[in-house]
Amino acid sequence: MSGGPIEFRCLECGECCRRLLIDSRLIRKGLPLFPDECGLFPRELIRPGVGIGQPGEPGFRVISYQMTEMVCPHLDEGSCGIWETRPTVCRSYPYMPVVTQGGYVTKEASLECTSLMMEAARRHGVFKIDEGSLEGELRALEKLSGITVEAVENLDEAWSYDLRGGRWVRFERLRP
């Protein structure tokens, strides 16, 4: 490994905006959105994301939504057309919240990020990110993690919406 922690720098390649659908275990998920962020995208591209309660029953509430497309409609020649108002998940990148086997929510850096992949190759796969260069991203990640934390805290009532099957799947079935 060469040097100390790296300072994350976005290369504005747009790759993170071209791989928005994730096939994980039993479902396909899209770009997660808070309810107040749904207006950033055309209505026909939005589906539920995570819900608490029993789908179809009174009291069921959707706590997040998701965008259904692989490529962001706001991507314009490698840059974001809504940079100033982009969704929280975009603000948190390259970090994403993940649930560990013990049920804890932690952060994980995406090695699909071109900038991080280049640094990993240069440093033979071992490096640490200078999180001081990612203050805004970490604040956004904390907000985004709230959805996952609420789902884990309500595991017996939490559901994720599968874009492939168009159905709700129990959140607990998706845990590692």
PLM regions: where:
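Short loop/turn segments that flank or connect secondary-structure elements
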Residues: 1-176
